[in-house]
């Protein structure tokens, strides 16, 4: 089973924030694959489907960003999901709004949700799809920026990136991730 995890924060006040683009991609995949995301005992929204003959699972941790690993590790253990079958989707300050970048592994890059995953999974060896949100301008604190909403100017590029990231996830169901990287990295 492939597990697609979108990082974000639960609650109405965070729904459309930059930090929640991982949730946006999971919502898009749920729509495409007709998956109903339900609250699971793993402190997250979770649903499964069969896509191109492959079993897939979607997850939106409800632990808040900095504790994402507390949801994902028990889920992987319960369903016996290998680290090779996990793809994590999240926001990246170091990419401009609308850019996506796929990686096979890596450090947290300062992202607290990814730090939590690395801590709870015990490895950096999981696949990632990073969606650019850009950096704050004019000395705005990073926390305020990531918890802020996209500007009207940023929205079209971000909407396109969410669709591209979902397309990459769809391809990753069947294709080797290295091929998906070659097709989607800009």
UniProtKB/Swiss-Prot annotation:
* Localization of this protein: Cytoplasm
Identify one Gene Ontology CC term for this UniProt entry: cytoplasm
Which InterPro entries does the entry link to?
Answer: Pept_tRNA_hydro (IPR001328), Pept_tRNA_hydro_CS (IPR018171), Pept_tRNA_hydro_sf (IPR036416)
- Where does it primarily localize? cytoplasm
Q: Which residues bind tRNA?
A: 14, 64, 66, 112
Q: Provide the E.C. number(s) assigned to this enzyme.
A: 3.1.1.29
Q: Which SUPFAM superfamilies match?
A: Peptidyl-tRNA hydrolase-like (SSF53178)
Q: Which residues form the active site?
A: 19 (proton acceptor)
Q: Which UniProt keywords apply?
A: Cytoplasm, Hydrolase, RNA-binding, tRNA-binding
Broad class of enzyme this protein falls into:
hydrolase
Any Pfam family from its record, for instance, is Pept_tRNA_hydro
Q: Residue numbers for the site described as Stabilizes the basic form of H active site to accept a proton?
A: 91
Q: Name one GO biological process term.
A: protein quality control for misfolded or incompletely synthesized proteins
**Which superkingdom?**
Bacteria
Regarding protein family, the annotation reads: Belongs to the PTH family.
- What assembly does the database describe for this protein? Monomer.
The record's section on HAMAP family has: Pept_tRNA_hydro_bact
Q: Which NCBIfam families match?
A: pth
Q: In UniProt terms, what function does this protein have?
A: Hydrolyzes ribosome-free peptidyl-tRNAs (with 1 or more amino acids incorporated), which drop off the ribosome during protein synthesis, or as a result of ribosome stalling. Catalyzes the release of premature peptidyl moieties from peptidyl-tRNA molecules trapped in stalled 50S ribosomal subunits, and thus maintains levels of free tRNAs and 50S ribosomes.
Write down what this protein is called: Peptidyl-tRNA hydrolase
**Source species, please?**
Geobacillus kaustophilus (strain HTA426)
